[in-house]
Amino acid sequence: MTESLDPQIPSSWHPNGKLLAFTQVRPDTGNDLMVLPIDGDEASGWRPGKPSVFLSTPFNELEPMFSPDGRWIAYYSNETGTFEVYVRPFPGPGGRWKISIDGGSYPVWSRARHEIVYQDPEHQLMVVSYTADGDSFTPDKPRTWSEHRLLVRPGFRSFDLHPDGERIALAIAPEGDRVVTQDKLVFMVNFFDELRRLAPGSPR
């Protein structure tokens, strides 16, 4: 779909199916966020267009994820010296909102609720509720979803939300000093019911 000597890592499709967000590793600016337009259809064939830069800074930005309505992109960046999760309007320009506290990576939007799930530096899942009004994005304070720690593989996300927002699959790290000999995938049902049980005061 693209021709580049720079490494490119796809992350998410826009809901309209015609835009692909990806990370490109450049020698001068590091990891940048890019968008690839794609025209055509199944009958006539798909035709990739020219990639455009969504965000390029002297810092590293990674994992651009389109919101379910296509109006926002969540990603993580080390502009503060620590990787944090941010949200920007798409296609921009506009503001920038940091939704994580004390570090974060691998944001995933819930398709069923105004929630973003991400991984914190302690390899735990965090959940952020948000409201979006026009060009304004207001995140709530992050809250811990579970005391379980994810089994982390560098460069890979170890969890994902089901489209119904009720189930989550994740790889859990072994307890204590046990050595991992075989990875296990855990499938969580009624994800947000469990979240409300652990934090009764959390919004519905």
Residues of each region from the PLM?
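Conserved beta-propeller blade repeats
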Residues: 5-23, 53-76, 97-117, 151-167
